[in-house]
Amino acid sequence: QEIIKGHVTLGSLRVRQDYLLAEGLLAPYAEDGSVPEAMLDFALARIRQLAAHELGHTLGLEHNFAASADGRASVMDYPHPYVILDAAGEPDLSQAYTTGLGEWDKRAILLGYQHFPDGVDAAAAREQIVRDTYAAGLHYVADVHSRGDAFAVSAGPAHPLGSLWDNGSDP
């Protein structure tokens, strides 16, 4: 039996910061003083994504900075908000942050927590999970290959799929 405990604190300044990002994108300076609901939705979507990210750490998941190149396949990436322009040329924040776990997250949890019955070669079964994950087109780029490592010799952010704060498949 395994007991997992994680303690994560997400301060209100994070929500405020994302609210201000939305304000900068939307410039909602209407004469009547109204504020678009999209600003709060944007900020709350980010805090939900961040909460899932931090919970992932409590489960043992590391950052995966290639997930943004794989269609937002993991909450363990550092996502830049995905903002598009609507038909009128106005910023649309409705898809800024994804909801739920990504495919990479599900595969990583399967790898780390799958119980194999007696008689099954667990090492071979885990290797097959990894092979199937990569065969599905998912990638993994760790911290050391995205931003370097203070404790190892590293080329730093040299991997084309491992940029922090990006979004999309074009490295």
What do these predicted regions represent?
Residues L55-D70:
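Catalytic Zn2+-binding segment of zinc metalloproteases
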Residues D70-P171:
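Conserved catalytic/binding loops enriched for acidic/polar residues
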Residues E2, G6, H63, A73-S74:
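Flexible, active-site-adjacent loop/turn segments at secondary-structure boundaries
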Residues V15, G60, F116-G119:
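Aromatic-residue detector
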